[in-house]
Amino acid sequence: MAIKKYKPTTNGLRNMSVSSFAEITTQTPEKSLLVPYKNQAGRNNQGKITVRHRGGGVKRKYRLIDFKRNKDNIIGKVATIEYDPNRSANIALIFYADGEKRYILAPKGLTVGTSIVSGPNSDIKVGNCLPLLNIPVGTTVHNIELKPGKGGQIARSSGASAQIISREDKYVLLRLQSSEVRKVLGSCRATIGEIGNEFYKLINYGKAGKKRFLGIRPTVRGSAMNPNDHPHGGGEGRAPIGRKSPMTPWGKKARGIKTRDRKKSSNELIIRRRTK
């Protein structure tokens, strides 16, 4: 994927960039794989905000993605590469030999007409899915399961991948892009290759309105709020925060504090913690 930049003919276009969508082959999604998508605006089932700065945005439908890749030993052919408004990665529509259609995350290098297959005996080829124990050390993978049969949970966004660095008994050691090294059961599945659309993170939205189209609402500084809304709020004019360290809106220390639960059961599977 390439990035397309605009000439600064208006204030909104100055510094703005968009994806060239050169890899996209159709603008019409597969109807049988679309379901309604309700915008929760960052609220939970009690109506309370659990994720800030969410809401609004254009109406969209959810594309049903096959994260499990459990259709074994049936060859599928890539019919289209499509844009998905619900994620940063592109998706590929697969026509299987038995007539079924499924969407998968489109890895880098996957093109229309390419054949893919899932199963323990699959070839080590981009787009194929197989258990981690059957994949050679040094291979780059994505859409990695944490529990066998649950579906991929790691390395699913644009440009994401992990590398297999060794095997230990029933576990496989993965190096993630965050530099974290962790154990994953060898019976968990992963797909060969890295996710495409890798330049997505370089896109400059250019104006606030474009973020609103995506359902992203403004982020207000704590120092601009009242003291009953944020620990940084209040004071006369541009007052300092008046605390030893920056605080979250809920009064907890922000920046530089480890937020992971010390008693989390999966801590023993993390060999080296992430550095970024």
UniProtKB/Swiss-Prot annotation:
PROSITE patterns cross-referenced by the UniProt entry: RIBOSOMAL_L2
One GO CC term on file: large ribosomal subunit
Residues annotated as transmembrane: none
GO molecular function annotation: rRNA binding; structural constituent of ribosome; transferase activity
Described function: One of the primary rRNA binding proteins. Required for association of the 30S and 50S subunits to form the 70S ribosome, for tRNA binding and peptide bond formation. It has been suggested to have peptidyltransferase activity; this is somewhat controversial. Makes several contacts with the 16S rRNA in the 70S ribosome.
Similarity annotation: Belongs to the universal ribosomal protein uL2 family.
Assembly mode: Part of the 50S ribosomal subunit. Forms a bridge to the 30S subunit in the 70S ribosome.
Protein name: Large ribosomal subunit protein uL2
Organism: Phytoplasma australiense
Name of the gene: rplB
